[in-house]
């Protein structure tokens, strides 16, 4: 393939999504500080971090198209990060119960050869059911979504937390908006469909 693909993420969920393109790719885990800067908006944060993650590939690779992605949950104009433990996950889900939450996913494609990058932000809205304390606790014990923005895994049992999903690409909720990604790759000359002629279908 003319452009090797590199995913700047150790997330198995993002890797699984990228496999839908049926193209070979490498992965690496970018080591970046994900803390928000002073007065940084949620959109600015995910844009900056997706770019930082993609550009970190220059330490490991010399050529290729690097895909960087970052996601935050926004509720009442506040950024909610990963919960890291059950206490914080229960607290987040209790806040979300009966309300809508916006998830912003920053996506960056960075060309290691030219240094050019293209970035976009994909919003997705989730309306939660009214949940009981017992339901929230049972969900957290079952799926332990402590490293996930929003304290859930929508690709698993987390789907049962929702009343409604609104957005252009449900893949963005898992962390990698594939529709936008295919468009950005095409802008760099990599058409995912045309590239299938060199890639056996699995």
Curated annotation (Swiss-Prot):
Enzyme class name: hydrolase
Keywords on record: Cytoplasm, Hydrolase, Nucleotide metabolism
SUPFAM superfamilies: ITPase-like
Pfam families in the record: Maf (PF02545)
Catalytic activity from the UniProt record: N(7)-methyl-GTP + H2O = N(7)-methyl-GMP + diphosphate + H(+)
Record-level GO BP terms: nucleotide metabolic process
Active-site residues (renumbered): 70 (proton acceptor)
Family to which the UniProt record says this protein belongs: Belongs to the Maf family. YceF subfamily.
Protein function: Nucleoside triphosphate pyrophosphatase that hydrolyzes 7-methyl-GTP (m(7)GTP). May have a dual role in cell division arrest and in preventing the incorporation of modified nucleotides into cellular nucleic acids.
Protein name per Swiss-Prot or TrEMBL: 7-methyl-GTP pyrophosphatase
Native species: Pseudoalteromonas translucida (strain TAC 125)
Lineage: Bacteria, Pseudomonadati, Pseudomonadota, Gammaproteobacteria, Alteromonadales
């Amino acid at each position: 393939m003319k452009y090797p693909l590199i995913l700047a993420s150790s997330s198995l969920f993002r890797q699984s999504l990228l496999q839908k393109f049926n193209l070979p790719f490498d992965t690496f885990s970018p080591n970046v500080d994900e803390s928000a800067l002073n007065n940084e908006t949620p959109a600015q944060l995910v844009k900056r971090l997706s770019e930082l993650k993609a550009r970190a590939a220059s330490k490991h690779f010399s050529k290729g198209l690097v895909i960087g992605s970052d996601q935050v949950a926004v509720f009442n104009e506040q950024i909610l990060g990963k919960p890291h433990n059950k206490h914080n996950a229960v607290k987040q889900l209790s806040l979300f119960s009966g309300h809508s939450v916006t998830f912003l996913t920053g996506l960056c494609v960075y060309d290691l050869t030219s240094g050019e990058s293209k970035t976009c932000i994909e919003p997705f809205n989730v309306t939660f059911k009214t949940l009981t304390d017992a339901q929230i606790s049972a969900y957290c014990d079952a799926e332990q979504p402590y490293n996930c923005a929003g304290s859930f895994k929508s690709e698993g049992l987390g789907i049962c937390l929702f009343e409604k999903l609104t957005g252009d690409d449900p893949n963005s909720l898992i962390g990698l908006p594939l529709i936008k990604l295919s468009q950005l790759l095409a802008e760099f000359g990599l058409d995912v469909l045309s590239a299938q002629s060199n890639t056996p279908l699995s």
